[in-house]
């Protein structure tokens, strides 16, 4: 199955669970302490990242979705740091602050890519009244299309069964990242995402694929789930649904550097995709592609729609299509090594029309490979004003990537692509319209590197503004 990227701007997910703050202190080590036989780390870098349920919310927000996060924190500095970080990422935080408990914090001391020690600051939340967290959930349910319950056995989901029932009352699907062998407490959930170890803890050792399916179906029936998504490391994922054939999704990871937070990414992409209207099988395929990206990164990591789009294009596209900046620079180097002439252009391409297609075909004829750099949503808004773009970045790029003339599509967030062009340095930079060569962003850098800059004519009578005005005026 090759899924298509949904518009995550339309997704809205409520995340309830164990939130935590991950702190990293890193630096070089060059000596052993005279006080004890331990290395001395000269701390040069300090990082803070949301963890647990907060990482799920951060993943959804990174895709462009609306993430509403409910959890338990203390009344302390880590809670303030966590809230500040999440709100800067456009996550709506609705925490229950409990002064008698500390905010769960994990401090890792790192050196030369290795973790030397982890210090946990926590006291699992226990005997916490249900009302504060349930009432926050009830208030949020009317404005979301999916619920994620992220369980790290720290106490936020002590009343998980009540939470499931609240979501079921309003027909909102509930996705759970489980913890422990007691699946009874999750009875009635839409879907659970156990990894293979968690699955076998409940059902016993799995002998083969048939045994996995049989035991999974038994779990679904016994606990009134609609589905299970079993994540299986190098064997990919298996989606099991009531009275349906299993769906086996092979792993898409090319290299595995760190599996930290991969489960959070899986459930966040799954829930966000379902909340946009994607069917469960396609949402799982998107989650599988996302997992293949994040395990190639160090630490808890999010991914962007650009990276996800690139992942679902897959290797069959031979590295072409939607691509990130680093991958583009590498691809251009390879093209030059093959003796190919690289042409580059840029624009908003908000509503693709015949003039655009003609222009891009002409540009492609001038070389062997054509790069189209596309303004992101924020960049278009600054240039064009309120109400633009009509189509979000991922959709504009998807349309451009589908044109035969275009080899690579890459986004840029600045007002002009000057920085990007100066990194890529194409053989030929083209721009449509009546620009003077010296006014074209990036032109000076291309010429200084021995390249060319050309201005191409647009087809008369075609413009995005004209199309928008015609639609507003009701003209065909």
From Swiss-Prot:
Record-listed ATP binding positions: 195-198
SUPFAM superfamilies hit by this protein: Nucleotidylyl transferase (SSF52374), Ribokinase-like (SSF53613)
Enzyme Commission numbers on file: 2.7.1.167, 2.7.7.70
Keywords: ATP-binding, Carbohydrate metabolism, Kinase, Multifunctional enzyme, Nucleotide-binding, Nucleotidyltransferase, Transferase
Pathway membership, UniProt: Nucleotide-sugar biosynthesis; ADP-L-glycero-beta-D-manno-heptose biosynthesis; ADP-L-glycero-beta-D-manno-heptose from D-glycero-beta-D-manno-heptose 7-phosphate: step 1/4; Nucleotide-sugar biosynthesis; ADP-L-glycero-beta-D-manno-heptose biosynthesis; ADP-L-glycero-beta-D-manno-heptose from D-glycero-beta-D-manno-heptose 7-phosphate: step 3/4
Region (Cytidylyltransferase): 344-476
Function: Catalyzes the ADP transfer from ATP to D-glycero-beta-D-manno-heptose 1-phosphate, yielding ADP-D-glycero-beta-D-manno-heptose.
Summary of subunit composition and partner proteins: Homodimer.
Name this protein carries in UniProt: Bifunctional protein HldE
Lineage: Bacteria, Pseudomonadati, Pseudomonadota, Gammaproteobacteria, Vibrionales
